[in-house]
């Protein structure tokens, strides 16, 4: 049995084949995502940035790349919402603003950055630390005092002033970069990247791409500790992992919303470094051995035996080959189980042909931390983690979406999922093991903190996602803040609106048919599509996923301005009915009515 380590690098990534990277077979080049990405490609700036608590961001790498467009700048309200959402305990964010020569903001986004390096592994049932505890998860949590992350912004003529602010509001630092200067400073960087990727192979994971990276969650598998002769094994491992990852809810219901890619970067040696480790749990397996790998994978990070990490700066630079990434999973070929979650999350995989439930559960548990901001629900009073409270008015003190110190029904963040017949607090398991209530014992404390589910994946990684967990993953997918695009996945496919112009001019009495194509899981329930004129709803219809909705607007009196908006609502039952409108997306047209003489004018693009 080949045991292999999977380094789930949730620091976000993607890939596009360049001249130095071996091309996949012709058939794989024709997958839907690659076709759409090439069709809508546009130039972008790609930076790797380092920052620390109280230390201003510094650019350590720059490259101009091609990305799937169009880029959509976040509005001020959405920026504020995402920034507030990133002040929680799991992470904070970098606020990114690109300005033109007049100082006007022409593009802005939020980048989510983890605050913690986690080691959460599943102990054997007979392990001494498993006895007398409500979980087999063995947790070690370390604060990240420095962060490395990627910034991607579109190339816009006349806009070279990039401002990056980092950290929680009370400690936020900022720096401004001249992108033209960075381009000159890093001239030749592409040659350096190409040399580091000599012999690399990039391809889509067969059967796991569905559309443009501009409107999907793009997961990149990055090979570490695989030699040039190990490409076959890397394919087997990642094929199986993608299949297993997408086989459980909520992912299985939203398979069309994810793309999987892989980049095999050959290493000279197999596995990862195993330094001598002071951890008393160290089993001294091949300790003191070192191997030459592409991303410097090593065990015993921070003195914790199974804490496996890679050089995130090197990984992010390599990922510039496909800059559409949202999540990186670095697969480390090793016989020793280990892992971490943070800027780069790591977990082990027993066998590339099967992927054990233990490994799958830990990977999805870490994904839930980083992608959906979910908190741990198990008790471990040795965990060194910041306290939280939903009783305070300061949002930076609030707890994660699935845990709380609120003990009464009306104050529960997940009260919409709690049946009126369920007592709060809840003391016994419910007949439906995934149903919501309020059980005491959560977020490492056995009293004073409450969890939303009796026993789900955030309490025991062998358990499924509960209803609140599932919804939070989908809410995060739709609201964004985790990659590119920063605004999340849309229920309206980008690039399908007609007319494509955001601003139109019509003559009095003229008509125009407005339309766009919907996007939701298929098979699945129809979407509810609402049309608004100046914020007054004028039509509601039921539209099958992937179908187009249209509305014909007739221009009234000359000299007036009208706003027409299409709103598409995902009706999947994994989203509570009260949540669905909150994550719906819209397409908007502004129409000016002239006094005549303009048969049909389009302004903008």
Q: Where in the sequence are the language-model features?
A:
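Boundary at the C-terminal end of the N-terminal hydrophobic targeting segment
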Residues: 19-22
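Bacterial N-terminal signal peptides
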Residues: 7-16
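Active-site-proximal segment of zinc-dependent metalloprotease catalytic domains
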Residues: 200-216, 222-227, 239, 243-383
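Exposed beta-strand face motif in extracellular beta-rich ectodomains
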Residues: 158-160, 558-564
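Short beta-strand elements
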Residues: 171-203, 576-602
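Short strand-edge motifs at loop-to-beta-strand transitions and within beta-strands
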Residues: 149-151, 547-551
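Extracellular glycoprotein-like low-complexity segments
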Residues: 24-198
């Amino acid at each position: 049995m080949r045991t292999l380590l999977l380094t789930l690098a949730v620091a976000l990534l993607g890939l596009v084949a360049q001249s130095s990277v071996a091309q996949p077979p012709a058939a794989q080049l024709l997958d839907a995502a690659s076709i759409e990405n090439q069709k809508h490609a546009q130039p972008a700036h790609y930076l790797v940035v380092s920052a620390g608590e109280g230390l201003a961001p510094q650019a350590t790498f720059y490259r101009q790349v091609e990305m799937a467009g169009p880029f959509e700048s976040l509005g001020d309200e959405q920026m504020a919402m995402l920034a507030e959402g990133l002040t929680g305990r799991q992470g904070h964010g970098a606020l990114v603003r690109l300005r033109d020569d007049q100082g006007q903001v022409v593009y802005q986004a939020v980048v989510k950055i983890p605050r913690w390096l986690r080691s959460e592994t599943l102990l054997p049932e007979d392990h001494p630390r498993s006895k007398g505890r409500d979980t087999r998860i063995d947790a070690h949590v370390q604060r990240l005092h420095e962060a490395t992350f990627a910034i991607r912004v579109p190339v816009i003529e006349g806009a070279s002033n990039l401002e990056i602010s980092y950290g929680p509001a009370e400690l936020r630092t900022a720096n401004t970069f001249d992108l033209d200067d960075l381009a000159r400073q890093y001239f030749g960087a592409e040659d350096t990247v190409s040399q580091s990727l000599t012999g690399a192979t990039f391809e889509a994971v067969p059967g796991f791409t569905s559309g443009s990276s501009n409107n999907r969650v793009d997961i990149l598998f990055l090979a570490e500790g695989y030699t040039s002769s190990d490409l076959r094994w890397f394919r087997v491992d990642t094929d199986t992992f993608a299949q297993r990852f997408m086989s459980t809810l909520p992912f299985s219901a939203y398979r069309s919303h994810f793309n999987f890619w892989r980049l095999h970067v050959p290493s000279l040696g197999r596995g990862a470094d195993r330094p001598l480790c002071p951890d008393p749990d160290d089993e001294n397996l091949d300790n003191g051995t070192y191997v030459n790998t592409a991303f410097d994978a090593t065990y015993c990070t921070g003195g914790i035996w199974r804490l496996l990490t890679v050089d995130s700066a090197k990984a992010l630079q390599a990922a510039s080959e496909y800059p559409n990434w949202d999540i990186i999973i670095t697969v480390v070929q090793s016989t020793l189980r280990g892992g971490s979650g943070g800027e780069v999350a790591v977990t082990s995989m027993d066998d590339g042909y099967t992927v054990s439930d233990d490994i799958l559960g830990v990977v999805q548990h870490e994904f839930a931390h980083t992608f959906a901001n979910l908190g741990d629900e198990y008790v471990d009073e040795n965990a060194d983690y910041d306290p939280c409270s939903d009783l305070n008015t300061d949002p930076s003190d609030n707890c994660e979406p699935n845990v709380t110190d609120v003990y009464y029904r009306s104050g529960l963040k997940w009260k919409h999922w709690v049946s009126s017949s369920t007592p709060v607090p809840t003391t016994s398991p419910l007949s439906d093991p995934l149903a919501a209530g309020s059980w005491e014992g959560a977020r490492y404390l056995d009293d004073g903190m409450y969890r939303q589910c009796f026993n789900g994946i955030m309490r025991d990684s062998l358990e499924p996602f509960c209803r609140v967990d599932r919804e939070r993953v989908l809410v995060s997918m739709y609201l964004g803040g985790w990659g590119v695009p920063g605004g999340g996945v849309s229920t309206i496919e980008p690039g399908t609106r007609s007319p494509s112009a955001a601003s139109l001019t019509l003559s009095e009495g003229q008509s125009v048919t407005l339309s766009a194509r919907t996007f939701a899981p298929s098979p699945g329930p129809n979407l509810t599509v609402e049309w608004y004129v100046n914020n007054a709803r004028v039509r509601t219809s039921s539209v099958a996923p992937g179908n187009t909705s249209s509305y014909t607007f007739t221009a009234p009196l000359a000299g007036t301005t009208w706003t027409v908006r299409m709103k598409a609502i995902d009706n999947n039952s994994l989203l509570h009915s009260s949540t669905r409108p909150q994550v719906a997306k819209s397409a908007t047209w502004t129409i000016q009515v002239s006094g005549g003489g303009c048969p049909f004018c389009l302004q903008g693009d």
